[in-house]
Amino acid sequence: MNSKAFNTVKTEESTNVWLTPRELLDKLGHFDLDPCASTIRPWDCADINYTKEDNGLIQQWFGRVWCNPPYGSEAYPFLKKFSEYNGPGLMLLFTRTDIKAWHDYIFPTAKYLFFIKGRLKFCRPDGSQKATANAASCLIAWDESEFELLKKLEKEGLGKLAILS
């Protein structure tokens, strides 16, 4: 599989916008920046939200970052930028460890992976739930400051924490 298929998922709705479920966001705490926010969204994921028009890839990233990138080939540059940012925050991706991008940007530089139990039900821009995703999801952290939160989520039964060396 090549990197262009990085987060592609086929559903009855053909879209690469898979908004983070509010219930998950509420468990993750406060974020300063969302560099890939949907233009139309039922809730903000962070204090500052860059949309496609703002092009979060060319903007300065700061503070604790939340990144649920557009799925499909658009996810790859966000993954690269987050790995280079190497600051506090979390990225939500499908768990597709066979993809080259995982071996280029996650395994060599990330500190933690949190494998979410089950499959998420992402949301549409109006806030309604989509069907269950056909792939498992994980949270990726490049900064040690996320450890306590991820450990807490594991104790709550939300998933399993993996510490990368």
Give the location of each predicted region.
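Class I S-adenosyl-L-methionine-dependent methyltransferase catalytic core
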Residues: M1-S165
